[in-house]
Design a protein with these regions (language model features):
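Alpha/beta enzyme core
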Residues: 113-250, 256-263, 267
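N-terminal capping/small domains of soluble enzymes
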Residues: 2-106, 112
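Hydrophobic faces of well-ordered beta-strands that scaffold small-molecule active sites
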Residues: 26-30, 49-53, 106-110, 134-136, ...
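Short, surface-exposed connector motifs at secondary-structure boundaries
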Residues: 20-23, 100-106, 167-172, 243-247, ...
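Generic secondary-structure signature for well-ordered alpha-helical cores
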Residues: 96, 100, 127-130, 166-169, ...
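Alpha/beta catalytic cores of nucleotide-metabolism and tRNA/nucleoside-modifying enzymes
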Residues: 1-7, 48, 225-246, 250, ...
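Conserved strand-to-helix beginnings and helix N-cap segments that scaffold or border functional pockets
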Residues: 39, 118-119, 184, 282-286
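Glycine-rich, proline-tolerant flexible connector loops at the mouths of alpha/beta enzymes
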Residues: 55-83, 134, 138-150, 203-213, ...
Length: 316
């Protein structure tokens, strides 16, 4: 380097969503790394922008029946865990205090069987220290509507968001299921009910059958498909939702490398969730962050935030 010339600045990966300042747009998705205990000392944490804790219910849940809970597919993973978790009391007394060691914005994820349960969960977490935001897992079944997911229709989704909004004053995230006819309509309903951020997509409903026994391979019969197989479908839904709402979007679904991450951001995501890839390779955050910086440097783009929603559709 010649005398007098300063070293070029590294491209910036920091983003801000509804007041949440993330050092990178990479978010560890709920359920992948649990409550973070096993990763508290991992150098990978410095490449993440936020950490979403495993979904918590009001009472402990054992999850789906014993037997196979995951099945690998040619380009993904089908899981049927059944929201196994120790319950809210254990989260407050044990899991959350431990998670605070992660030195990352922590996002709690909650799942209820009724609107009232969601509201109670939000209310009891409202005074908890160390939580930057609350994610509503509205892909779980509504027992008052015969097991239909809360996120399957705008009215139910909005009811959950509105009830939690009354109890929770920090950023509120609605995480949407893709197993609907019009996900943008549901996203708008959540925004109107008070959601500060929309996250999508959760897994796609799936089934795997053993052709010899003629029985499902999963102990719970049905599961959720994640991994690279769903990425193009997830990108489309992120694009449609980002076009429909005026709040930030967290995109996810099949992210595997820096190119996938940037694709979601160009489609409209302000941050990107990492899920199945972390199971395959826990070093993915560093690899993806490095790849993003390399791309930005080559393209002479100073900040990744400039790419958010920059897609230009072909004419016609």
């Amino acid at each position: 380097m010649s005398e007098g010339k300063s070293k070029p600045k590294s491209p910036r990966l920091n983003v801000t969503l509804a007041g949440l300042r993330l050092r990178t747009p990479l978010v560890a998705a709920s359920g992948i790394w649990g409550y973070g205990e096993e990763h508290a000392r991992s150098p990978q944490l410095r490449h993440l922008g936020a950490f979403v804790l495993k979904s918590t219910t009001l009472r402990p849940r054992a999850g789906n029946p014993p037997g196979s809970r995951t099945v690998e597919t040619p380009a993904g993973l089908v899981n049927s865990i059944g929201l196994e978790n120790p319950g809210l009391d254990a989260l407050l007394a044990d899991k959350l205090p431990r998670a605070r060691r992660l030195d990352l914005p922590l996002i709690a994820s909650i799942a209820g069987e009724t609107v009232e349960e969601f509201a109670e969960l939000a209310g009891r977490l409202a005074d908890a220290d160390g939580l930057a935001a609350l994610e509503l897992n509205i892909s779980c079944p509504n027992v008052e509507k015969h097991g239909m997911a809360f996120g399957a229709d705008p009215e139910s989704a909005a009811a959950v968001v509105a009830a939690c909004r009354e109890r929770w004053r920090r950023p509120l995230i609605a995480k949407l299921t893709p197993n609907v006819t019009d996900i943008a309509e549901i996203a708008v309903a959540c925004e109107n009910a008070g959601a500060d951020i929309i996250a999508l997509v959760n897994t796609f409903t799936a089934m795997c059958i053993d052709i010899r026994t003629r029985r499902p391979l999963l102990g719970g019969n049905f599961g959720g498909l994640s991994g690279p197989a769903i990425r193009p479908a997830a990108v489309l839904r992120v694009y449609r939702v980002a076009q429909a709402v005026n709040v930030p979007v967290i995109g996810m679904g099949g992210v595997w490398d820096a190119e996938d991450t940037l694709e979601f951001m160009i489609a409209g995501a302000a941050a990107v969730g990492l899920g199945t890839c972390l199971l395959a390779d826990p070093n993915k955050p560093e690899e993806i962050a490095r790849g993003m910086r390399s791309f930005l440097r080559r393209e002479a783009i100073g900040s990744v935030s400039r790419l958010i929603g920059s897609v230009q559709l072909n004419p016609g």
